[in-house]
């Protein structure tokens, strides 16, 4: 059985954490101060249209 941590395993996408995050603050369910974002249905609909 071959494991992913095996020596010499080819990592195809080493840079998967680089670049912009997929989730934007505009579509987050909670704000940075911990309050809940209003109108969740509109927020989720807008997130799907991007």
Swiss-Prot record:
Q: Which gene encodes it?
A: sspK
Q: What is this protein called?
A: Small, acid-soluble spore protein K
Q: Which NCBIfam families match?
A: PRK03081.1, SASP_sspK
List where in the cell it is found: Spore core
Give me any GO biological process, just one: asexual sporulation
Predominant subcellular localization, coarse grouping:
other
User: Please, which domain of life does this record's source organism belong to?
Assistant: Bacteria
Q: Where is this region: Disordered?
A: 1-50
